[in-house]
Amino acid sequence: VGVLADMQIYGIRIDRKQLNEFSEMLDGRINELVNEIYRLAGEEFNINSPKQLGVILFEKLGLTAVKKTKTGYSTNADVLEKLKGKHPIIEEIMEYRQLAKLKSTYCDGLSAVINSKTGRIHSQFKQTVTVTGRISSTEPNMQNIPVRTSLGRELRKMFIAENEDYVLVDADYSQIELRVLAHIADDKTMIKAFCNNEDIHAVTASQVLG
C-alpha cells in the first residue's frame, strides 16, 4: 500500500510539448482522412455515426453487408476487417478510427489530467479492485497505454524520467498468477512446466483432453 501511495503522490512526468506536437500531427492526418473519406463517399456525412456510415458503405457504395443489428448495419472493427480490399474507403475509415481514438482517449485524455502544479500525471493505483489481485489503474489508466502500433509506441515515449540520471524501466511478469498458484498448491506438473519453460496452457489442455 505504501509503495502504491508513493507512486500516486509522486506521479509520472510527461513531455507536454511533445504530447501537444503529437496531438497536432494526429489532427492534421485526421483532417486529411476525413476529406479523403468524403471524396470516396461522394458526400459529407458523420463518420462517427454507425448508421450514416452503414448507409454510405452498404447502400450508396454497394458493399455487401456482413452483419446487421437492430438499429441497422454493423460497422464495427470486425466488419471493416472483413471488408478490407473491397473498397479504398475501408482502409481510410480504419485509420481514421485508430487515430481518432489515439487523439481523444490518449492525447486529449492525458493532457486533461496533467496536474497544473506538479506538471505530472497522478494516476490512481488500486490494489483491491480486481478479482485476481492484480493492481488496476484509473484516471488515467496507466496500464493501458497503446503499444501494438508504431504510433502507440510513440505515445509511450512521452513519459519521461525525472532527469538524465534516471531511466524508465518497463517489466512484465510472465503468468505471475499461475506461477504463484503452482507454488502455493505445490502442483508438481505446473512447477515442472514452468521450470522447463513449457507452455502452461498447452500442458493443461493435454491433461484435460488427453
Locate the predicted segments by residue.
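Short, polar/flexible loop-turn hinges at active-site or ligand-entry regions and domain interfaces
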Residues: 188-194
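A generic local secondary-structure boundary/capping motif
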Residues: 156-158
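Feature representing long, continuous alpha-helical segments
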Residues: 153, 178-179, 183, 202-203
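Conserved "right-hand" nucleotidyltransferase catalytic core of DNA-directed polymerases
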Residues: 1-150, 160, 165-167, 174-177, ...
